[in-house]
Regions:
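Hydrophobic core of alpha-helical transmembrane segments in multi-pass integral membrane proteins
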Residues: 40-47
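Interfacial segments of alpha-helical transmembrane regions
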Residues: 47-66
């Protein structure tokens, strides 16, 4: 698993770089959000498959699917006009929910070394949806929550993923916390 972390980081950085709009127009931001979310979904499924972790790939697919179904259901239940007025499917952001589901799945299965850059790309997707006039910040925040919950609730840690813990300690004179991680 460790041998595929570097290519994963390269893929995430490439996704982020490619999704940065060359022109700060609503269409440029929309294109950037598409590239970001589809790249994240591909990495969240492809990275486990590259490491022969079919369970991890399946968990990523189910996480993204669950987030997408919930977001779509809410769009139909609570129609809200988009900032650009194009339709009434603003709430919540489906792009953001899918991006955060993929990022949470990567973080849970691969560890923080892959998860943190994945969440950075997911955050960029949310920003791009707002800048592209497709969503309000509230739509993006709810989408991020849906995706994160789906990813973290459905995905299980890989046995080789870096693990960390926060331990409380104390005695009669002092108290504190100890953070431990395995490299």
């Amino acid at each position: 698993m460790k041998s595929i972390r570097k290519p994963a980081l390269v893929a995430l950085v490439a996704a982020f770089t490619a999704s940065c709009p060359a022109q700060a127009s609503p269409q440029g931001w929309q294109t950037a959000s598409d590239i970001g979310v589809y790249s994240l979904m591909a990495v969240s499924i492809g990275l486990p498959l590259a490491g022969k972790d079919t369970q991890g790939a399946l968990q990523a697919v189910v996480s993204i699917g669950a987030a997408s179904l919930i977001a779509t259901g809410l769009k139909e239940t609570f129609p809200k006009t988009r900032p650009d007025g194009s339709d009434r499917k603003s709430f919540p952001s489906g792009h953001t929910s899918n991006a955060f589901a993929a990022a949470a799945s990567l973080a849970e299965r691969q560890g923080l070394a892959v998860g943190i850059p994945a969440f950075a790309v997911a955050g960029f997707v949310g920003l791009a949806r707002v800048e592209g006039k497709k969503h309000y910040w509230s739509d993006v925040a709810v989408g991020a929550g849906i995706g994160s919950l789906a990813g973290f609730l459905i995905t299980r840690k890989h046995p080789e993923a870096r693990q960390s813990a926060l331990y409380p300690w104390g005695d009669s004179k002092s108290a504190g916390f100890t953070y431990a991680t395995r490299f």
